[in-house]
Swiss-Prot record:
Biased composition (Low complexity): 7-18
Signal sequence region: none
Species of provenance: Mus musculus
Family: Belongs to the UPF0390 family.
Function, in words: May have a potential role in hypercalcemia of malignancy.
Record's compositionally biased regions (Basic residues): 25-39
Gene assigned in the entry: D8Ertd738e
Segments for region (Disordered): 1-40
Protein name: Leydig cell tumor 10 kDa protein homolog
InterPro entries membership: UPF0390
Length: 94
C-alpha cells in the first residue's frame, strides 16, 4: 500500500460541457498530427485554398448550367445552422 494521502482528489467537472466532454469517450476516425516544418505547413495551406477554389468553381459551374437550362430562375438556399434549427418559432420539438 502507498504511504500517505493522495495530493489531488478526483473531482467532478464544474461545467456541464466539461462533464460531457469527459464522458463522451474516444472519437471515431483517424487523427492528423499537424506538421511542424514551415514548408509542409505552407504546402498544406496552399492545398486547402486550392481545394476550396476548385470546389467553389465546380459549384458555380453547376449552378450556371442549371439556371441556364431552367425556365424559372434558380434560387440557392443556405443550410440552416444548428442553433437556428433548434430555435425555430412556432414548431414544437417532437
Amino acid at each position: 500500500m502507498a504511504q500517505g494521502q493522495r495530493k489531488f482528489q478526483a473531482q467532478k467537472p464544474k461545467s456541464k460541457a466539461a462533464a460531457a466532454e469527459r464522458s463522451r469517450g474516444p472519437r471515431k476516425g483517424g487523427r492528423v498530427i499537424a506538421p511542424k516544418k514551415a514548408r509542409v505547413v505552407q504546402q498544406q495551406k496552399l492545398k486547402k485554398s486550392l481545394e476550396v477554389g476548385i470546389r467553389k468553381k465546380i459549384e458555380h459551374d453547376v449552378v450556371m448550367k442549371a439556371s441556364s437550362s431552367l425556365p424559372k430562375r434558380l434560387a440557392l438556399l443556405k443550410g440552416a445552422s444548428k442553433k437556428s434549427e433548434a430555435t425555430i418559432p412556432g414548431k414544437t420539438p417532437s
